[in-house]
Amino acid sequence: MAGGSILGTRVQRKEDPKFLTSGGVYADDVDDPRLANAAQAVYVRSAVAHGTILSIDIDSALEMPGVLAIHTAESLGLEPVASPFNPASARTLLASDKVRHVGEPVAVVVAETQQQATDAAEMVFVDYDFLPALVDLEEALASDTLVYDAAGSNAVFDTTALGLPENTPAEEFFADCEVTVTGRFMNQRVAPCPLEVRASAATWDGGRLVQWISSQGAQGAKDAFTAANGGDAEAIHLITPDVGGGFGAKIDTYAEELLLGPLAKQLGRPVRWRETRSESMMQLGHGRAQLQYVTIGGTKDGKVTHYQLHAIQDAGSFVGMGTILAPFMTRPMASGVYDIPNIEVRTTSVVTNTTPTTAYRGAGRPEATAAIERAMDLFAHEIGQDPAEVRRKNLIAKFTEPHTTAVGQVY
């Protein structure tokens, strides 16, 4: 494999026989002696998109059969965790002051069986003071209602803050164009839906946390677990067995996984958790969710010379990976396969009362492709030419030396 590239190289697959015959071993399949007599955790989730928590009543749930413990953020002593991308957007692993999307964990029930924990979770009553739910990006940008009061705005990140000089007024940027056309595109939100839902199991062995997790990024997960458990990486043994699909969403580490260690320590026995398909749809990080404003300009004979893209990224209710990753991956792919000499890309990330977004199959790159291809169609329609012919005129010419696009990508 010359230069480490798989292009033009036959790649032998070695992992298939196990999955086609005896089958893989996934996080919920793990049968380790250290997990003997494991209790089962089920999370109580918000049924509202946005609201202040007035009270959490667990009294009736504590009387349910098989219940071993019920915890809230207060009983676990959880402190707010600040986002590295926007410190003012801090939250606890279990919602404490208010809930910010449907499905956000509010409390956790630990019982002898999963069914007992599920039944008891139904008996936890949360009283809310309802707040306006922001589910539309443009509405969230204009609204006085804030997802995070301390942030001061629902726009929690903008590439202009990094000093990227890509915010030229349109009338100036497109001044030399014979033709300009604008568009507003919505690259819709998607849920990853891997065949294997999230699952995890935790136990303590000689003062060391041992935890199995379905993850695409074991080292990143190790960092998250270390931060959540006192900062001693040597005190954590994280194991990732076979993973039944993730599509990017399992790169993140989630509250439900991070809380199992403290629950197991408090209970003095192993604790397991497996989400339902409904929970996966609500809480496993979503993808895409990008609103795109495009302006494309050029000559009447079909040469595109200028292109501006302002991408509004829906971060969901948490300022996490989706806030940064997708927008940053959109920018370098903005030109697509076309030789467009003048390109500006600005991205703004906005929090809403929806499931947080994260990496998903390409993470910003397919969004960039969709934007430029739709813009090319608009341009072709405006000048009355065949879209295929307009594309042909603007394709990057055959090159032998490295080619650098207007957004800095080297081919």
Task: List PLM regions with ranges.
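General beta-strand structural signal in soluble alpha/beta enzymes
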Residues: A69-A73, H101, V181-F185, Q211-I213, ...
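Glycine-rich loop/linker segments at domain edges
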Residues: T9, E15-K18, A155-S200, A289-A375
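Helix-loop-helix junctions that connect adjacent transmembrane helices in secondary transporters/permeases
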Residues: L146-N229, L395-Y411
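Short helix/loop capping segments that flank catalytic or ligand/cofactor-binding pockets
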Residues: D29-V30, T52-L54, P80-V81, A117-A120, ...
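Phosphate/diphosphate-binding loops
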Residues: P105, A111-T113, K265-G316
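Alpha-helical support elements that line or immediately flank enzyme active sites
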Residues: Y43-A73, V108-Y128, S200-L267, I324-M333, ...
